[in-house]
Amino acid sequence: MLEIKSIPAFNDNYIWLIQNSDQRCAVVDPGDAKPVLHYIEQHQLTLEAILITHHHNDHIGGVADLVRAFPNVNVVGPKAEPIPTLTHPVEDGDRLELFDETFLVLGLGGHTLGHIGYVGDGKLFCGDVLFSAGCGRIFEGTAQQMFDSLNKLLALPEETEVFCAHEYTASNVAFALAVEPDNELLHQYRDTVNRLRAQNLPTIPTTLRQEKWINPFLRYLQPSVIHSVSSRTKNSDPLSVFTALREWKNEF
C-alpha cells in the first residue's frame, strides 16, 4: 500500500507525493519545486519519478528544478503534449510500474487535448479533469471529450480514491447546490467541507462513490439536474445537459 501526502502549492494546487516503505517517492504535477524539495529533504526521501497529467505551467513549472536536483529521475507524462522534460512519454492504455504497483494510464482529453490520468492501488490521479463536486474547464478539447473522459472515470470502482490537483471544493459545492438545492447529501458535504477548510485541511481525496452523489457533472441523468438546466438547453440528452452545466459553471 502506497502512502500519499499532499504538498500545497500556489493558492490552491496540490502536488501529490507518493511514498513507499523504503523512503523512495514520486510526485504528481509539481508546479513548484521548492515545497517538494523542502518535503523531500525534511523526510530524507529519494525522488524516483515525476508523473505529469498535462502541460499547464502550474503542473510542470517545478519539473526542471527537480530534474536538476535528481538527475536520474524518470519523468512520465502525456505523449501528445509539448513537455520537453519527459523521459517516458505515455498514452491511454499504457502501464507503468511504480514501487511494485501497476498504474494504468487513462486518456482524459477535454481540459487539454492530451490530458492523462494515472490509476493504480485504488488511487486515481486525475489532474484537472475531475474535482470534488466539479470538473475542469474545457480549454482545448470539446464538451464531448470532457464528457467521455468523466464517463471513463465513472467506470472505475466506486471505492477508488480521487486525488485531483486543486482545492476547489467549497466553490464547487456552492455551484452544485445551485443545481440541486434539495440534495441533502450536498448540504451535509458542504458542512464537512467548511469544517475542513476552517482548519486549513484538504478536502481531497474524495471517492468516486461520493462524487456520484454530490457532483452535478456526474449526475446528468438525475431529473433534478435535468430540470435545473432546462432553461439553458432545449435538449435533455446527457451530453446536452452536461454541456449546459459546464457553460453555467463558467459564468457562476
UniProtKB/Swiss-Prot annotation:
Family recorded in the similarity comment: Belongs to the metallo-beta-lactamase superfamily. Glyoxalase II family.
Q: What is this protein called?
A: Hydroxyacylglutathione hydrolase 2
Q: What is its EC number?
A: 3.1.2.6
Matching entries from Pfam families are given as:
HAGH_C, Lactamase_B
Q: Which InterPro entries match?
A: Clx_II_MBL, Glyoxalase_II_hydrolase, HAGH_C, Hydroxyacylglutathione_Hdrlase, Metallo-B-lactamas, RibonucZ/Hydroxyglut_hydro
What chemistry does it catalyse, as a reaction equation?
an S-(2-hydroxyacyl)glutathione + H2O = a 2-hydroxy carboxylate + glutathione + H(+)
Q: Which molecular function GO terms apply here?
A: hydroxyacylglutathione hydrolase activity; metal ion binding
State its role. Answer: Thiolesterase that catalyzes the hydrolysis of S-D-lactoyl-glutathione to form glutathione and D-lactic acid.
